Amino acid sequence: MNRVADVIRDDIKVMTAYQVADLPEGFIKLDAMECPHHPFAGYESLLSEWADLAKQAPIHLYPHTAKSGIYEELREIFGIPDKAEIALGNGSDELIQFLTMLVAKPNARVLGIEPSFVMYRHNAALYGMEYVGVPLNPDFSLNLPAVLSAIEQHQPSLIFIAYPNNPTGVCFKREEVEAVIRAATGIVVVDEAYGAFHHDSFLPWAGEVENLVVMRTISKIGFAGLRMGYAAASPSIMGELAKILPPYNMNQLSLAAAKFSLKHHQIIQQNIDTLKNERSRVMNELLKLNRL
């Protein structure tokens, strides 16, 4: 008798752990979509301020996120409506996990598109929920009739839509996403992890549409190591989410560093613009290759 094996859930035993590649030094790593350099590289005065900030951070105290000023910075820079309440996660992954936990009733379903971010399906399985995956069209566009049909048939408690989609990089038509939100009887999460690289956002709808959650992260704009995601939604959702989020899920260093970084958002935007230009350049060079 193996006492440990006997108490672990059978469905978890057959899962595969997420593997982070162990790459040699100097290897160019692109799979995680990290910024290739420190966001303040070349700004010696800001790097010095950053170091001083870390020294002064009250790491002997538990963090008080609401009093840290981070919500105000997020609202001002990203235009989050006053009607929307904000929740922070230790990366967007944590928010995905707890939003799934929030609706994990018996026989509840999660709906997503395929292919998309793997953590949607993973968390559905983790909480014993059926995951309904709706395949994209061959050109990776959204098969809206199939999605609407799946919503009507399965009545999912939670729907995830990555906007733009990950890993395909395709951004669906806004009116298609709006149609999904209108058709849903449960919560719709519009995951804008890559929203900084697109011209459109559902953040202005946050708090206005009761069943909508708009989720973003600072990871893709140069701060993957800080592990901070944020979600904006109506009080009816966020009030319930607050009951299950850990009280100290953000740490003092991440809060201080994120707030400092957001105060210098002009530099961050310059970095984003540089990445956009590089994206266009690489695409143009790839199109010159006959074998692609």
Question: Predicted regions span which residues?
Answer:
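PLP-dependent aminotransferase class I/II
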Residues: 211-291
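Residue-level marker for buried hydrophobic side chains located in beta-strands
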Residues: 30, 188-189
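Conserved core of the PLP fold type I
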Residues: 57-183, 194-209
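N-terminal "arm"/small-domain region of PLP-dependent enzymes with the aminotransferase-like
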Residues: 1-65, 73, 155
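A general structural signal for well-ordered alpha-helical segments in protein cores
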Residues: 43-44, 59, 67-72, 96, ...
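Hydrophobic "anchor" residues on beta-strands that sit immediately upstream
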Residues: 158, 187-188, 212-213
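Active-site glycine-centered loops adjacent to acidic/histidine catalytic or metal-binding residues
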Residues: 191-193, 229
